[in-house]
């Protein structure tokens, strides 16, 4: 009985972590990731990244 309760608790915790990670990924959509091109007219670089000039790629930013 104790083992079943522990499995249920760990299963719910894993489900919560998975849904949290998915939600974070969905909020970051629409931005350019590390070393992606960042030409004008494209979405901006993701948070923490900056577009470099003249190479126009997203790198760790200011």
Swiss-Prot record:
GO cellular component: extracellular region
Signal peptide feature range: 1-21
Location of this chain's protein in the cell: Secreted
InterPro entries attached to this UniProt entry: Huwentoxin-1
Keywords assigned by UniProt, alphabetized: Disulfide bond, Ion channel impairing toxin, Knottin, Secreted, Signal, Toxin
Protein's UniProt keywords contain Membrane: no
Propeptide residues, chain positions: 22-29
Gene Ontology MF terms in the entry: ion channel inhibitor activity; toxin activity
Expression across tissues: Expressed by the venom gland.
Sequence similarity: Belongs to the neurotoxin 10 (Hwtx-1) family. 30 (Jztx-14) subfamily.
Function: Probable ion channel inhibitor.
Entry protein name: U8-theraphotoxin-Cg1a 2
């Amino acid at each position: 009985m104790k083992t079943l309760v522990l499995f249920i608790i760990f299963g719910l915790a894993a489900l919560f972590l998975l849904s949290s990670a998915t939600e974070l990924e969905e909020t970051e959509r629409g931005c350019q990731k590390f070393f992606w091109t960042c030409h004008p007219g494209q979405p901006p670089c993701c948070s923490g990244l900056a577009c470099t000039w003249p190479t126009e790629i997203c790198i760790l930013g200011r």
